[in-house]
Amino acid sequence: MTIRYPSGQQPPNVGRAEQPIVAPHSSSFAKRGMSLEKEINDANRYYLATEQAVIYKKPTPIQLVKVDYPKRSAAVVKEAYFKRPSTTDYNGVYQGYYVDFDAKETRGKLSFPLKNFHQHQVDHFRRCLAQGGVCFAFIRFTTLDLTYLLPASDLIAFWDQQGRGGRKSVPLTTIKDRGFRVKTGLTPVLDYLPALDQLIAANQAKGADHE
């Protein structure tokens, strides 16, 4: 089956078998060449196997273009296109909380460009927050080897300011101040639950202040 992006290009990983998780010998060696998405996926599989959290990457919607029916009881998809996801990349449950987030990388050293997000993703964050969800942006500065969880509420605030003529990026200094650092380890390489615990605790503290 041929699966293509809207541009007509084929995705790089179609047809490849999912690789098993192998415990790395050192965090620096294990991280070499790994994308943020792969590290998150590996961490999620580890959390699922150890019954710490149930978090999955949402499948990308596919638009079918050509389907053959060699048999009445079977259909064979010959060509399809990946559609733009309608929400965010990941969601699941952790300690009774609904968790929803998206992962982005930037090679910048001073700020994170807001153009990496889309309006529909920000709107989705708003809806999830209104229902009490724990939402955030996974942001990695690749050249600095820094990864943070930025609360969705802060991302939304900068997004709205951008629409009113404000800056079109979030300064790294702000992300360090309002976000939660995700440190690397061994198994998993990107252990983000401690940072998520900090975010949940901060949300609870804010809730207590408003009671």
Curated annotation (Swiss-Prot):
**Gene Ontology molecular-function annotations:** endonuclease activity; magnesium ion binding; nucleic acid binding
- Compartments, record wording: Cytoplasm
The UniProt record lists the EC number as: 3.1.21.10
Question: Cross-referenced InterPro entries, in alphabetical order?
Answer: Resolv_RecU, Restrct_endonuc-II-like, tRNA_endonuc-like_dom_sf
Q: Which UniProt keywords apply?
A: Cytoplasm, DNA damage, DNA recombination, DNA repair, Endonuclease, Hydrolase, Magnesium, Metal-binding, Nuclease
Instruction: List positions binding Mg(2+).
Output: T87, D89, D102, Q121
Query: Which Pfam family is one of those matched by this entry?
Result: RecU
- Note the Gene3D superfamilies from the entry: 3.40.1350.10
Give me the disulphide-bonded residues.
none
Co-factor requirement: Mg(2+)
Q: Is the S-adenosyl-L-methionine keyword given for this protein?
A: no
User: GO:BP terms for this protein?
Assistant: chromosome segregation; DNA recombination; DNA repair
Catalytic activity field: Endonucleolytic cleavage at a junction such as a reciprocal single-stranded crossover between two homologous DNA duplexes (Holliday junction)
Q: Where is this site: Transition state stabilizer?
A: K104
Q: How is the cofactor bound?
A: Binds 1 Mg(2+) ion per subunit.
A GO CC term attached to the entry? cytoplasm
NCBIfam families documented for this protein: PRK02234.1-5 (NF002584), recU (TIGR00648)
Functional note: Endonuclease that resolves Holliday junction intermediates in genetic recombination. Cleaves mobile four-strand junctions by introducing symmetrical nicks in paired strands. Promotes annealing of linear ssDNA with homologous dsDNA. Required for DNA repair, homologous recombination and chromosome segregation.
Instruction: Give the UniProt family note.
Output: Belongs to the RecU family.
Q: What is this protein called?
A: Holliday junction resolvase RecU
Q: Which organism is it from?
A: Limosilactobacillus fermentum (strain NBRC 3956 / LMG 18251) (Lactobacillus fermentum)
Highest lineage ranks of the organism? Bacteria, Bacillati, Bacillota, Bacilli, Lactobacillales
What gene is this protein a product of? recU
